[in-house]
Amino acid sequence: SFLPEEDQGVFLTMIQLPAGATQERTQKVLDQVTDYYLKNEKANVESVFTVNGFSFSGQAQNAGMAFVSLKPWEERSGDENSAEAVIHRAKMELGKIRDGFVIPFNMPAIVELGTATGFDFELIDQAGLGHDALTQARNQLLGMAAQHPASLVSVRPNGLEDTAQFKLEVDQEKAQALGVSLSDINQTISTALGGTYVNDFIDRGRVKKVYVQADAKFRMLPEDVDKLYVRSANGEMVPFSAFTTSHWVYGSPRLERYNGLPSMEIQGEAAPGTSSGDAMALMENLASKLPAGIGYDWTGMSYQERLSGNQAPALVAISFVVVFLCLAALYESWSIPVSVMLVVPLGIVGVLLAATLFNQKNDVYFMVGLLTTIGLSAKNAILIVEFAKDLMEKEGKGVVEATLMAVRMRLRPILMTSLAFILGVLPLAISNGAGSGAQNAVGIGVMGGMVSATLLAIFFVPVFFVVIRRCFKG
């Protein structure tokens, strides 16, 4: 993953009912969600704030959101009371609601990179196949994703489903013959049905806004549109029925574009035990089976994760090269940097073992800890190698004798500096509450790397130094 999940003390729940569902029906589902959190999770949930008619998928009567505020972290000690655990239980229970989709999800660690944790997948109509073909491809992809519950969970479209729409068609030739302009037609429709701001007026010392709109009872039915009138160029009032026809159609309530092309967003998460990289690779594999002309791309945190994942090998390689060149310039030797850099993998092994044991993910903070361990591992080796080099050059001792003396004399400084650093990152490794995800990712990785680099370096650095010196001497 790009960033670890954080317990921010609040998470979201999105409610999506079938297209055409009324606001009252949506409210009943919101009430069920609220009752669940306040009764079943009363030990962890402080309050629930619901919004009817709005969600991240769009504004509609069949959409809703619930903002769940958790109690302070000191009152929710233990992994079973974390936001992640509460969300997991909510998915199991709220998934039983048959009247619509109820999807609890955590907020991203960086809000600017998306609206939810997991991946953001854009399905794109690259060949102009049309809305129906894109919808069919989306449903096909969702069906294939549902067949992999061990790798993918909560795979869902992030948008509003097609619904009934009232389409008003204007016969421009008739309107022109009657002396009615299109701008007047649009203005009349906008004012009567949506309302138009006119001006302000002062009422008892307060500024109030004036809006013009048809009364509710005159804009409730499709037939009410035919009763609207627009003024023609010669001043006559012309009814809409004279130049318009209307009928019901079925279509998308909003236009979605990605890089200028028709698209549909799909969100989802990796199943427990599956890395986000594997989940994203599986989605790409499934998308490759869709009809020709349907493409895909990543957005939000998934896009950043793809970029950072591709850069990680180069970043580690550059770190190795920079450390090696600095050591070569410092000691004016090629053998010493080689013997020092051979110790770095020992620290990396510790980082990987610690991350595996404590179920840490390969995120950007893990990479920070990994790069830090490279430098710290080299530091321990330098303490031994530099002293052995001085004994060989200034006192004329043999490579084995100088190395053994260096190990004995530098053991205490190695242990002291390493122990100081391990204790320094210990608060990061054991932290909980706000920001603990990022702190754990750095602290656990660096701590594991320092433990392995310290314990193994004492035994392996002398061996590496002796072997490399003899090889270069030979």
Language-model-detected regions and their locations in the chain:
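Signature of alpha-helical transmembrane segments and their immediate interfacial
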Residues: 1-2, 408
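Alpha-helical transmembrane signal-anchor/signal-peptide segments
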Residues: 2-13
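Surface-exposed amphipathic alpha-helical segments in non-transmembrane regions
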Residues: 12, 25-50, 60-164, 173-299, ...
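Interfacial helix-loop-helix hairpins and adjacent transmembrane helices
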Residues: 19-25, 29, 46, 404, ...
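Membrane-helix entry/capping segments
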Residues: 293-315, 358, 364, 436
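Loop-to-transmembrane-helix entry motif
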Residues: 301-319, 406-417, 445, 449
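Hydrophobic transmembrane alpha-helices and their membrane-interface caps
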Residues: 325-410, 415-434, 448-452, 456-459, ...
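Structured binding elements
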Residues: 345, 438, 442-443
